[in-house]
């Protein structure tokens, strides 16, 4: 049993995944500006409050960092504070408190500059096309540095398109390509549980795509299978509650 802190636990991804480690006997501590009435116990804390993050990180075995501005937005007004400073606060609190494992939410938008029908492997590299994706490239770089320099075990999860609302699901459906990078709520929960439970040696850093099945698969599933023993079960529109 592990103690697992989840930042952004009341957000779209957080609400989809927090139940799974609880069901498997882990102790989950939610951390979100919104007070979540679910079992994860988010209490209105903000990742921009370093002291609050530091206090919450004490005694944790794993931190899943989801809290962020979740879409493209004005870089100076909307993205820098949560996606850059907030990320630093979480990573540095993990270091200060001796949290051995850090799981960082990255994004499929990092490969948006590749052709829309291309099968993308990690070695093909990141090709962001907006500032939101750039903040997630920063997150991957920070995760690698904290693993190498400070000995944390770090997974950067390049998350597929997980619908956060009915409108978001309809946008995915109508996009012409979103179903090929779809990540269901159910598969996301299974993926993050695998991340929590996998044994990793100190100072190890991995980038892993997280997606569901697709008629035309775009994201290489091999790292998730090899590192986590994760295999997707759903295909669009399975595993999401909206449409």
Describe the residue ranges of each PLM region.
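Short alpha-helix in the Rossmann-fold core of NAD(P)-dependent oxidoreductases
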Residues: 82-87, 91, 103, 135-136, ...
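NAD(P)H-binding glycine-rich loop region in Rossmannoid oxidoreductase-like domains
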Residues: 47-82
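Conserved Rossmann-fold NAD(P)-dependent oxidoreductase catalytic core, especially the SDR/UDP-sugar
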Residues: 89-129
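N-terminal Rossmann NAD(P)H-binding glycine-rich loop of SDR-like oxidoreductase domains
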Residues: 4-23
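Active-site helix of classical SDR
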Residues: 124, 131-138
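Alpha-helical substrate-binding/gating segment
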Residues: 161-168, 182-204
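Conserved C-terminal active-site "lid" loop/helix of NAD(P)H-dependent oxidoreductases
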Residues: 170-172, 204-231
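Conserved beta-loop-beta element that borders a ligand/cofactor-binding pocket
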Residues: 140-165
